[in-house]
Amino acid sequence: MLVIFLGILGLLANQVFGLPAKNAGHLYSTENPPEEELGFWCTYMESCRFCWDCEHGICKNKVNESMPWIIENSYLTTCAVSRWYDQCMYEEGNAKHYHTMDCSNPVPHNRPHRLGMKIYEREDL
């Protein structure tokens, strides 16, 4: 009984936090993941271009309101994401760097990219 309860609780947590459920099916490699999964994909690889709305070189994160506005530069990278059973994978940039993780136990891959982030600071008008 406890196992069933914990299983149901886990599925509910996945829905609340935007994590892809194990039974969500496979996601073939795409540069435009489903809108309802952006919360998951953009948390663990926030430099992906699909996580940002950019206009005139200034970008705002689509998912995380606490992220600062940034200047569009090499920090943003083209990413393709895919899911096969419990394996979630990011394929980033032209060099095709891969980051693979268990979807149920995700690991952020943000640190190496944050070094290139340029925060936008408004000048006083």
Swiss-Prot record:
It is found in: Host membrane. It is a single-pass membrane protein. Keywords: Glycoprotein, Host membrane, Membrane, Transmembrane, Transmembrane helix. Residues 1-6 are cytoplasmic. InterPro entries: ASFV_fam_110. Residues 28-116 are extracellular. Pfam families: v110. Glycans are attached at residue 64. Plays a role in virus cell tropism, and may be required for efficient virus replication in macrophages. Belongs to the asfivirus MGF 110 family. This is Protein MGF 110-3L. It comes from African swine fever virus (isolate Pig/Kenya/KEN-50/1950) (ASFV).
